[in-house]
Amino acid sequence: KTKKTGLVAVIIPNMLNPFFAALTDYIEDALYKKGLKTMLCCSDGIPEKEIAYLNLATQNKVNGIVALTYSDIGNFINPDIPIVVFDRFFENRNIPRVASDNYNGSMMAIEKLLELGCRHPVYIRFHSIFPGESDKRKDGYLAACKKYHITPDFLDMEDCDNFIDMMKQFNISYKTAGENI
């Protein structure tokens, strides 16, 4: 059997998104407490980079992989390396995953926003050609809009190099339009 390195590869799509940054911090801390080191890989959501990082993880004999991916990486996973994916489901593949209850989470978020006085909740979405948990978040948002008689509003993001700048611009555009989102 090949000796492992005590490394776990963590593949994320973006380091600037506050959610991914916080999640990566928690993952790294949990791995460290177990005596493992983190090999952080930022794919920028580019399938070729994700595949290259999977290959790099295999070459470095990692103990495992945690992948937050927007791509169908199922065909490129080394069956000898344990992997878990986050908020992603690959049809016809037995890949362990961690997922939230995105449908009800979205409903709860809209309810909380309305409770806090928000009159126009907007759903910000990033596109992926693969089905995933974001579809359930969208469905929860639409159900909440229907339940509370809100006209759904979507902000489509094709590419986001800087999440924080994007959110600032989004906020400015709605304030300029006189919206209380």
Where are these regions (language model features)?
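Acidic (Asp/Glu)-rich catalytic clusters
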Residues: 74-80
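Bacterial carbohydrate/catabolite-sensing allosteric modules
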Residues: 29-36, 48, 52-58, 81-85, ...
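Short loop/edge segments at beta-strand edges and connector loops
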Residues: 42, 69, 156
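Flexible, active-site-proximal loop/turn residues at the rims of small-molecule/cofactor binding pockets
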Residues: 14, 71, 127
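Amphipathic helical "hinge" segments at domain boundaries
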Residues: 1-56, 60-63, 139-145
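Conserved beta-strand positions in the central sheet of alpha/beta enzyme cores
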Residues: 9, 66, 122-123
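Short, polar loop motifs at secondary-structure junctions
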Residues: 67-73, 86-91
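Short, Asp-centered acidic motifs that coordinate Mg2+ and/or phosphate
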Residues: 63-65, 181
